[in-house]
Amino acid sequence: MRVPLSWLQDLVQLNETVEILAEGLSMAGFEVEAIDDLASHAQGVVVGLVKDHQPHPNADKLSVCQVDVGSGEGLQIVCGAPNVRIGIHVPVAMVGATLPAVGIKIKASELRGVPSQGMICSLAELGLESNGNGIAILEEIAENVPDLGQPVGPLLGLDDTVLELAITANRPDGMSMVGIAREVAALTGASLQLPQLDMAPIHKSFEPDSTSSASMLKGGLYGLTALENVDGELTSPAWLKQRLERSGCKSVNGVVDITNLVMLEQGQPLHAFDIDALEMITGQTVSAESFGLRQARNNELFNGLDGHQLQLNENCQIVTCHDIPIALAGVMGSAESGVSAKTRRVWLESAMFTPTAVRTTCRAVGLRTDASSRFEKGLPVEMTLASARRAVTLMEEHLGIKSNGCWVYGESPKSAEPVKLRREAIHRLLGPIGVENDNRYLEDDIIETSLLALGCELSPYNEGWLVIVPPSRRRDLSREVDLIEEVSRLVGFDRFEANLPDPLEPGGLTTAQTAERLLRQMLCGAGLQEVTTLSLVGADSDEPQRIAISNPLLAETSHLRTNLWEEHLRICQRNLQSSQPGCWLYEIGNVYTVTDELINQRAVLGGVICAERSFERWSTSGKIKSMTYHQARGQLSQVFQGLKLDINDRPLKDNHSLHPGRSAELFVEGKLLGDFGQLHPALSERLDLPEATYLFALDLQCIIQAATRSNRWNPTFRPFPTVPAMELDLAVIVSKECSCSDLIQAIRKAGKPLLEHVELIDRFEGGQLDPYSCSQAFRLRYRSKDRTLSEDKVNPIHEKVRQALVKQFSAELRS
């Protein structure tokens, strides 16, 4: 945002130097990226009169001019401009002058054998917009030309200073001169002299078609003002052109210049359509009801005002007239409908478009404009009609244009709700300020002065104030903490004291934090790498329950995520496309769901085990050996064993992202922990991922609670065994529906008190087994506390285990 100080001075009284003003704005959040002193562009450039003009003896395209600069002695200057002639006043750069716009220092030189003592300048060489290729002729720029030898800077508007500000996304009010003026007034206490606006101009209603109606209501408001007695050939007054040029806008014609001026002044983009051009394009009479707002069709063509033809798609929102595209909504108008020298009637559009729609359109066509940069940040709907009325007033005053009515479709802006601002909350969050070696809390009058400077309305109550923020000024002040931040910003962050806890106490990790760190170590030890992904995702028609955020910067980051695995699979895709053999990763992060209209935030451990982990394949004779379900599940078992957790697996039936026959619900202490399983074949095919891709999503809080039980977490002494153990294998044929965890649980129960450990060592399907059965083999370790076991002591218990499996699971014994 370019802020000319001469324009700012007309809106607010400036008593500070440029440097102090720039520092104050930067400290308040409007970073000043550069200070452009326009006078430096014309330092050493004076008014000259061409007294003589002769062809160069040694060059066809050069001429030798005798120029009078009021010093008594004429200057001989070699010039290459085609429009130089006798009797014109021109800007002359004297020897020693520097032209920053082109990086030239003027020296006395000799061009093709002819001495030259200066340079006759074009507007471009002085850093100004120029429509021609020749030198600047001062008679064509101003009616009254200064005396010879006088500085040319004031005549060309090069007597100003421009601040270049970086405006953040949360401060759209900073994209207007009025917004910056209010900020300066709030910081310095200076008085404002703002243009008077009609905040509720008289208007009529119109009814668009149903599709346009929904889109216009989503934006908030769509207004059209009919203008007559327009002369498209009229140019803007010199002061208006200078303001636009200093602000970085090019002058086009009177109508367009005033719409741009109002955009820079008030922050509300406007657009003018030539009514006669619209009727020629559509072949029909154009009224307010003729306008529409819809999504573009794929491959629909659009000719922009910048001269480029764009191929649109369904992501682009367009303004139409009788369903023919005439503008990219909030971005740019069409070349066919723009104001030209032949324009006599105009529809002035003043509308609100949603930031998401404008941002999506810009990304779809690869184009950003001054208008779109404002719509993307979000604008107050209260200023839409007021800005249009401001533009009409300027056109009536300077161009003789007449208004023939205003038509509006949309809902009336709602009145602002008061925000409670508690005195205690201010003191608690900000702390005391240092005043003459004495720390004290902010006094009420300082707080009230800061809020009144923002234009707020205050109503005191026993705990503080009820604050109403005018929506036309600031849309980001909707909470108590927002107001507290504004108070601290205006008072000065550097004035608040640093308050440390007294006394300072040593820090430390809680048991839960220590357990989480141990969990991360175990996961890394199992070969998984930790990642961190963004918690914001795009909308998904398959997941309508995703929570939308109120003011997204991008359509791709407009909602809160409901799971971790979607982004994890994208990471796997990128790694495999980069020739990585596999991708094993995990993340501890939050997911967000809605229950009974309440937003729930839940910490989740999620991860992916995808394909191989290492490059070398010597152990498999160079062949790719896909990881099986049980091998992948075993990697997770290592982690749980490190936390001393016993996990039970049960068949999973209702997760459409996982393979229906190779997935399980995991339970710890009888509580559901989460899901583990192979990626569904349809998903793996669509995402071009290998079949051997396994996902897990587990409740972090459940893991931490189970791992930190005192019987697991607190270390206990257990002596090393002093007697040998006896190991026996047990193989049974059971139904495929029978889970390993159920079998192990039954074995442990039946094997007491001598059974020390049991583990699955083999699982087999196929061969001579029927298609509904499988063989599972377990290794059981028996040990007594005080003596060596003999077979006659172990066999009865082992037989008890065998019979328990036969009775509970109809198992067929194989060993």
UniProtKB/Swiss-Prot annotation:
PROSITE patterns: B5, FDX_ACB, TRBD. It catalyses: tRNA(Phe) + L-phenylalanine + ATP = L-phenylalanyl-tRNA(Phe) + AMP + diphosphate + H(+). Its EC number is 6.1.1.20. One of its GO terms (molecular function) is phenylalanine-tRNA ligase activity. It is found in: Cytoplasm. It comes from the Bacteria. The keyword Aminoacyl-tRNA synthetase applies. Pfam families: B3_4, B5, FDX-ACB, tRNA_bind, tRNA_synthFbeta. GO terms for cellular component: phenylalanine-tRNA ligase complex. Residues 39-153 form the tRNA-binding domain. Binds 2 magnesium ions per tetramer. InterPro entries: aa-tRNA-synth_II/BPL/LPL, B3/B4_tRNA-bd, DNA-bd_dom_put_sf, Fdx_antiC-bd, Fdx_antiC-bd_sf, NA-bd_OB-fold, Phe-tRNA-ligase_IIc_bsu, Phe-tRNA-ligase_IIc_bsu_bact. It is an enzyme of class 6 (ligase). Residues 414-498 form the B5 domain. Belongs to the phenylalanyl-tRNA synthetase beta subunit family. Type 1 subfamily. This is Phenylalanine--tRNA ligase beta subunit. It comes from Prochlorococcus marinus (strain MIT 9313).
